[in-house]
Curated annotation (Swiss-Prot):
Residues 104-440 are annotated as: 22 X 15 AA approximate tandem repeat of Q-P-K-X-G-D-I-P-K-S-[PS]-E-[KE]-X-I. GO terms for biological process: cell differentiation; cellular response to reactive oxygen species; flagellated sperm motility; spermatogenesis. Testis-specific. Strongly expressed in the testicular seminiferous tubules, mostly in the round spermatids. Coiled coil: none annotated. This is Thioredoxin domain-containing protein 2. The lineage of its organism: Eukaryota, Metazoa, Chordata, Craniata, Vertebrata. Probably plays a regulatory role in sperm development. May participate in regulation of fibrous sheath (FS) assembly by supporting the formation of disulfide bonds during sperm tail morphogenesis. May also be required to rectify incorrect disulfide pairing and generate suitable pairs between the FS constituents. Can reduce disulfide bonds in vitro in the presence of NADP and thioredoxin reductase. The modification Phosphoserine is found at residues 42, 51, 158, 351, 379, 407.
Length: 550
């Protein structure tokens, strides 16, 4: 081939400076045979014209034969069409050069090589062209096995065409196909071939339009009916990639279209059943739970105020009755919703396996409501018990307060404006309340509360020579509350001393007569005469005065 290329370059008048060792002899032969080259060129033009007609006729026959015999449309169109365009157009650049070179070859070589290459190319190119005329969607139409088989069948052929075109640049059918696309076909072969070229052009336009999403309009021809079907399926598959729903797809789209419908139907049916069961069960639960909750809460609200009102009363017998009434009602209220929720749970567990998670979420809510109800129902018991404990202590404190606040009617009353406390700081109640139980015993036996002035004078007469200690105090006075426990404790130590307590608010006249101006004030009497007096919350001074004056 290298020698032939040198000969062709010399025939054209091109100068080659570097040639192999055998090149001079061959160049001489070519120069001697210069006259023969012209004759061979003319004969070659005739032979090439005839070979073009034969090749094009064989191409048309094979294309018609291939299009009618194929029962199923070939699959891979887009890739082969693009591949055919890619392989043909590079040839278009080199084809004029190869054609001019081939005209100057020897007649024997041309007849042998062109006939062999044209036969091989006519057997190969119609297949590739027939394949290029059909649309392709390898991923969406037929199974992958057919697609890979077609690819494997096409690649060697196209690669052979490329290799042969690079080696010899002899392929006339490629030149003819290029010329047919450009409209350079000879007039003798233009008539029988024009119809087929129009069909192939239409099919190529259909494949390009199918890629753009346009429907092919070549369904009028009987031969193109299969192409229309494949183009429509290709359009549907391309539209499905863009987001449209495919109308006809064979493998993946049919599965994708069937499975979403099946899944949607199953999910909707299951969702409908689940939603109905869930709604019914939730409604039944809510109706069952709300009723006992309302009943129990109303009963609790009605019963708890009664128990609270009764607890304010000192008798404990009235507290136990509402407790007995409320506890059975609570037990009944708790048992009813628990049975209802258990039945509701049994109804829910009948649902399918797919709704297990929904059941778990649903069944948790009744348990939470039961726990909430139990917490609600338990809390009144605790509150009632706390009320019982609370109501016991107020009885004692109320009794003690009643006994403490009772003042004698005979005591001397004094004006409140004249009474002043000796200390502004008031003691805390925590320091006073621990002595309340002790105060009750002291008030009963040791400390006597004076109610009026007459009673006070009688006590002084009866005492005679005994020491009488009198505490002038008021309930609102903080230092008075602080000194009261100490005053009662000293009454237990000194049995030979009479301890009296005067409420300045009840005995104003007595306060005025005794000239009490500060609270608390302690006065000491013997033989109806005053022997000692001091004011203020002074515990040590009180003890010392009693010990000295006794």
């Amino acid at each position: 081939m290298f020698k032939k290329n040198q000969k062709l370059s010399k025939d054209k008048g091109l100068e080659v400076n570097s040639v192999q060792a055998g090149a001079p002899e061959e160049s001489d032969v070519k120069l001697n045979n210069g006259g023969k080259a012209n004759e061979r060129g003319s004969n070659e033009f005739l032979d090439t014209a005839q070979s073009k007609e034969k090749v094009i006729a064989s191409v048309v026959g094979n294309m018609l034969h291939m299009s009618t015999e194929e029962s199923e449309p070939p699959q891979q169109v887009s890739s082969t069409s693009m591949f055919s365009e890619n392989t043909i157009y590079p040839k278009h650049e080199g084809s004029p050069k190869s054609s001019t070179k081939n005209t100057q070859l020897k007649q024997e070589d041309i007849s042998k090589t062109s006939s062999y290459s044209k036969q091989t190319n006519s057997s190969n190119i119609p297949k590739s062209l027939a394949i290029t005329t059909y649309p392709k969607q390898g991923s969406t139409l037929k199974p992958a096995a057919n697609g890979t088989h077609d690819r494997e069948a096409e690649k060697p052929k196209s690669s052979e065409d490329l290799i042969q075109s690079k080696k010899g640049d002899i392929f006339k059918p490629s030149e003819d196909s290029i010329q047919s696309k450009k409209g350079d076909m000879p007039k003798s072969s233009e008539d029988p071939i024009q119809s087929k070229k129009d069909d192939t052009a239409k099919s190529l336009e259909d494949t390009i339009q199918s890629k753009n999403g346009d429907m092919p309009k070549s369904s009028e021809d009987p031969i193109q009916s299969k192409k229309d079907d494949t183009a429509r399926s290709l359009e549907d598959s391309i539209q499905s990639k863009k987001g449209d729903m495919p109308k006809s797809s064979d493998t993946i789209q049919s599965k994708e279209s069937e499975t979403p419908k099946f899944l949607q139907d199953t999910i909707q049916s299951k969702g409908g059943k689940i939603n109905k069961q869930v709604k019914d069960s939730m409604k039944s639960k809510e109706s069952k739970i709300r009723k006992p909750l309302k009943d129990s809460i109303q009963s609790k609200e009605n019963k708890i105020p009664k128990s609270s009102q009764d607890s304010a009363q000192p008798k404990e017998g009235k507290i136990h009755k509402p407790l007995k009434d409320s506890l059975p009602s609570k037990e009944g209220d708790i048992s009813k919703p628990s049975e209802d929720t258990i039945q509701a749970k049994e109804e829910i567990t009948v649902s399918p396996e797919d709704t297990i998670q929904a059941k778990e979420e649903i069944t948790m809510s009744p348990e939470d409501t039961i726990q909430a109800k139990e917490e609600i129902t338990v809390s009144p018991e605790d509150t009632i018990q706390a009320k019982e404990e609370i109501t016991v202590s107020p009885e004692d404190t109320m009794q003690s307060k009643e006994e403490i606040t009772v003042s004698p009617e005979d005591t001397v009353q004094s004006q409140e404006g004249d009474i002043k406390s000796s200390e502004d700081v008031q003691p805390s109640e925590n320091e006073i309340f621990p002595f309340e139980a002790e105060i009750e015993t002291l008030e009963e036996g040791m400390v006597r509360v004076i109610k009026d002035k007459e009673e006070f004078e009688e006590v002084l007469k009866d005492a005679g020579e005994k020491l009488v200690a009198v505490d002038f105090s008021a309930p609102w006075c903080g230092p008075c509350r602080k000194m009261r426990p100490h005053f009662h404790s000293l009454s237990l130590k000194h049995e030979d001393v009479i301890f009296l307590e005067v409420d300045t608010e009840d005995c104003e006249q007595l306060v005025q007569d005794c000239e009490v101006f500060h609270l608390p004030t302690f006065q000491f009497y013997k033989n109806e005469e005053k022997v000692g007096e001091f004011s203020g919350a002074l515990v040590e001074k009180l003890e010392k005065s009693i010990a000295e004056l006794k």
